[in-house]
Amino acid sequence: MKFMKIGSKLDSFKTDGNNVRYVENELASDISVDVEGSRFCLHKFPLLSKCACLQKLLSSTDKNNIDDIDISGIPGGPTAFETCAKFCYGMTVTLSAYNVVATRCAAEYLGMHETVEKGNLIYKIDVFLSSSLFRSWKDSIIVLQTTKPFLPLSEDLKLVSLCIDAIATKACVDVSHVEWSYTYNKKKLAEENNGADSIKARDVPHDWWVEDLCELEIDYYKRVIMNIKTKCILGGEVIGEALKAYGYRRLSGFNKGVMEQGDLVKHKTIIETLVWLLPAEKNSVSCGFLLKLLKAVTMVNSGEVVKEQLVRRIGQQLEEASMAELLIKSHQGSETLYDVDLVQKIVMEFMRRDKNSEIEVQDDEDGFEVQEVRKLPGILSEASKLMVAKVIDSYLTEIAKDPNLPASKFIDVAESVTSIPRPAHDALYRAIDMFLKEHPGITKGEKKRMCKLMDCRKLSVEACMHAVQNDRLPLRVVVQVLFFEQVRAAASSGSSTPDLPRGMGRELRSCGTYGSSRSVPTVMEDEWEAVATEEEMRALKSEIAALKLQEESGRKSMDRAGVTAISKIRSLIMSKKIFGKKVQLQSKGGGEKNNGGGGGGSDSSESLGSMNAAEETAKTATPSRNLTRRVSVS
């Protein structure tokens, strides 16, 4: 740190212990100056020769023969006035970055200009600032920090602007010319670990200045960053790194995505300023930092404009995000645990970039302007879209654990990435299964719409094994999973595809998703939507073993396993159809009979018996038809 000594006489200021300061001198004091409760007993001649303010005040008090002057409004208080008084007496005064602003403002208040006396205090301080302090990196930052208590006078004296300009100029210097000390704690360089103290002995990073600027208050920090952007062409990554460092330093808990209790107004100002200072270049800041800013914006209840700006920026690089970073807590008073709507906006912004269009203005033959909208190819790579789909699938699994999350919000987020072709739907299946597990009371329509999102053909063998044994899924989905696993096993061994009953097979082959059966009659829809009973689930579970045996056995054994599996599926569907028809007949004409001797339990037992009979009939009838059909094809 640089300093300057002014004067040559010894310091002869004394105190009597009662806030009274005096100069030890043979001459008695002839003027008393009061400064905020402290009294200075001094002499007129040295003070009046350099201070125009005291001359004016003393001339007005002499008329009443009063030699007491009150200057409690002087900047810097008693300490700054004492420094100015010592300069008037010629005593040694030491100025540094810590007290130069207070002394400069006090000298301005006292009117210690060159017009009063050549070589006055103001002139000497200005020379010290321009020739020494403003040429030092850390001293300039300290001087700028000390101007805060003396606003607006320090601003009027251009001390603030001069400091900001000096700091920005230093930050824009080529790194090869950086020869001063700075704070940089990101990583220890090899030269530092070996004990090398010379700055020239190591490479200077481009963001060498970012940590030192974190000492500034947000209003000064904003002005310095803006000045840096104006003075030199720095990469957006450097500015982004500076904003990131400031956020981590100034916002408690920001690195962990939380906001500790404190001055919310101050935190809000910092967050909104950081968002405003974000570089325009894409990828100048990481997606993780942007999401932390968005979480902080939500916590301090910033305006929608700030949120929308962050949503647009995050949507441009969503492929960099992780699932944990997308878990944005809802504001207080919200029913849901996470702000799902905000994440959906981000996903929609990401997908919007893949649907760009361009308006081209042309002149026709008559001279009129004609606008033509041309669709341009998307700018998103397949890898980026797959990464986003993977993250959203994991995000869906996590938010599905919230018991208060409506099914509509879960489905809306999942549907926002349905246009992305994914090689596997295992993660989506896990998310749907988690939601069904945590929300057993959802409606049949919601369950249908949710299962429609999943393509059974893209489930792995492990996922298929789990799905067939999953009693939370509708029977229709279970049958689809089993059928497509049969098809996959048949294709891998070169055997023929197993047959299904007419209508059901056509529907399954035409689509692999759950919601593609609009042409199926209503009665069939009800049968599909039904959840399998315990007996039916046990029958379906046994088919998984057959799927694995198919690959190990030959073509003949596979055909037999396929026939058996499909026959059992038929029997399950037939049993439900017979049961459904019986219930319909009873509801139309058997109301009185049901109210008579037979109760609900007797009806159920009859239905179960009918189902068993239908199963036996299907088991004996259908395999022969399937085998006959296979022979005719071969």
From Swiss-Prot:
Biased composition (Gly residues): 588-602
Phosphotyrosine carried by residues: 429
Positions with biased composition (Polar residues): 619-634
Signal sequence extent: none
Localization per Swiss-Prot or TrEMBL: Cell membrane; Cytoplasm, Cytosol
Tissue: Specifically expressed in the hypophysis and the root meristems in the embryos. Highly expressed in primary root tips and radicles.
Pathway this chain belongs to: Protein modification; protein ubiquitination
Sorted UniProt keywords: Cell membrane, Cytoplasm, Membrane, Phosphoprotein, Ubl conjugation pathway
BTB domain location: 29-97
SUPFAM superfamilies referenced in this protein's UniProt entry, alphabetically: POZ domain
Transmembrane segments: none
GO terms classed as biological process: positive gravitropism; protein ubiquitination
Domain NPH3 intervals: 207-488
Positions of the UniProt region annotated as Disordered: 492-517, 584-634
Database matches in InterPro entries: BTB/POZ_dom, NPH3/RPT2-like, NPH3_dom, SKP1/BTB/POZ_sf
Disruption phenotype: Plants lacking NPY2/MEL3, NPY3/MEL2, NPY4/MEL4 and NPY5/MEL1 exhibit severe reduction in PIN proteins (e.g. PIN1 and PIN2) abundance which are less phosphorylated and lacking polar localization in the root endodermal cell layer and in shoot epidermis due to increased clathrin-dependent internalization from the plasma membrane; this leads to defective expression of auxin responsive genes, defects in cotyledons and floral organs formation, as well as impaired root gravitropic responses.
Superkingdom of origin organism: Eukaryota
Gene Ontology, cellular component aspect: cell periphery; cytosol; plasma membrane
Domain characteristics, as noted in the entry: The BTB/POZ domain mediates the interaction with some component of ubiquitin ligase complexes.
Role noted for this protein: May act as a substrate-specific adapter of an E3 ubiquitin-protein ligase complex (CUL3-RBX1-BTB) which mediates the ubiquitination and subsequent proteasomal degradation of target proteins. Plays an essential role in auxin-mediated organogenesis and in root gravitropic responses through the control of PIN proteins (e.g. PIN1 and PIN2) polarity in the root tip endodermal cell layer and in shoot epidermis. Recruited to the plasma membrane by PINs (e.g. PIN1 and PIN2) and, in concert with AGC kinases-mediated (e.g.
Family of this protein: Belongs to the NPH3 family.
Protein name: Phototropic-responsive NPH3 family protein NPY2
Gene: NPY2
